[in-house]
Design a protein with these regions (language model features):
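Bacterial N-terminal signal peptides that target proteins for export
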Residues: 1-9
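Bilobed "Venus flytrap"/periplasmic-binding protein-like clamshell domains
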Residues: 25-53, 65, 88, 111-184, ...
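Short helices/loops that flank or line small-molecule/ion binding pockets
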Residues: 69-83, 96, 114, 179-194
Length: 321
């Protein structure tokens, strides 16, 4: 017992020492989700990260994974301490990777959110969403990363779940890619239909309008909350303050405004919390509820239990708003 107490006291002492010296952190890794090729993401984000290094006195290293899960897992194992996510991937980071939302994108035009799209080539025979819903086996489909809000969760719920369809079986073939990959696949007629979002289309309108001219938007989602920035909860409070002060104060001069404009046409960032994820959590739960309701292979008792569990979670989220 005495040995156990000594071991515990020793561990607590080490922990206290670690916390006491935590403000001496010299480097942090900032995870960037893979909405486009790593080279393009570096070009957009590195000027911002370099300015963060100068302002905070902490070296900020960009971490560019090939998929969303790579950033989530890196944050889980403390290989990444700060990250940009979509709302759906931020939920995974908060629930599994010690994450906590601390800031949110603000659009250049003041829009409080963005939109998910279904797109096709302008030469395509697909003219309406009804054609997509009624004749899926005639078409190939490009969906987003599994952890993408606008590339997967939102279109899956609003286009397919509400119409009692599963995109995995509805189409002749389905492939998964990031937003850039899906846009280019439609542009090059490699898939008939794909998910996209207003961030990607606005970028294309500005940088390659001739490419955007080849694209037809078939469906537009309800407004999606703008993306969050997430840090690990266990970062020291003084480091958190340095980071948040820099982030929410960024964009005051012309140089910073230009950097933000190149980052998906941003005006800056505002302080935020995990509460911004509630609408997306509700969306995921509604999607699961409808899936269970329509599952003919599930027993009535199991179905009732699962639906009751979802309803309890939805009620708790409604109170948390």
């Amino acid at each position: 017992m005495l040995k156990t107490k000594k071991t515990l006291l020793s561990a607590l002492a080490i922990s206290a020492a670690t916390l006491a010296s935590a403000s001496d952190i010299k480097e942090l890794n900032f995870g960037i989700i893979a909405t486009e090729k790593a080279g393009a993401m570096r070009q957009m984000w590195e000027p911002f990260l370099q300015d963060m290094t100068k302002a905070t006195g902490i070296k900020i290293n960009g971490f560019y994974a090939t998929d969303y899960a790579g950033v989530i897992e890196a944050q889980r194992f403390n290989k990444v301490q700060l990250a940009w996510y979509g709302n759906k991937s931020a939920i995974d980071a908060v629930d599994r990777s010690q994450g906590e939302v601390f800031a949110q994108f603000v659009d250049l035009d003041g829009t409080p959110g963005y939109y998910s799209y279904l797109i096709t080539h302008k030469d395509s025979a697909v003219k309406t969403l009804d054609q997509v819903l009624q004749n899926g086996k005639q078409y190939s489909f490009g969906i987003g990363d599994p952890s993408s809000t606008s590339g997967t969760l939102v279109p899956t719920y609003y286009v397919f779940t509400l119409n009692k369809l599963d995109p995995k079986t509805h189409f002749r073939v389905m492939r998964s890619s990031n937003h850039e990959g899906n846009f280019l696949a439609v542009l090059n007629k490699q898939v008939d239909i794909a998910t996209s979002n207003s961030e990607m289309t606005e970028k294309m309108k500005e940088k390659s309008p001739e490419k955007m001219d080849q694209i037809r938007i078939l469906w537009t989602s309800p407004l999606i909350p703008r993306d969050p920035l997430v840090w690990r909860k266990d970062l020291p409070s003084d480091v958190k303050k340095k980071v948040q002060d820099f982030v929410v104060g960024y964009g005051k001069n012309d140089r910073e405004k230009e950097i933000l404009k190149n980052m998906y046409r941003l005006a800056g960032f505002k302080a935020s919390t995990d509460a911004q994820l509630i609408p997306i959590r509700q969306l995921e739960l509604f999607k699961d509820r409808m899936k269970f309701e329509s599952d003919v292979n599930m027993s009535a008792a199991e179905k009732q239990t699962k639906i009751a569990d979802i309803d309890a979670k939805l009620a708790a989220l409604a109170k948390a708003k």
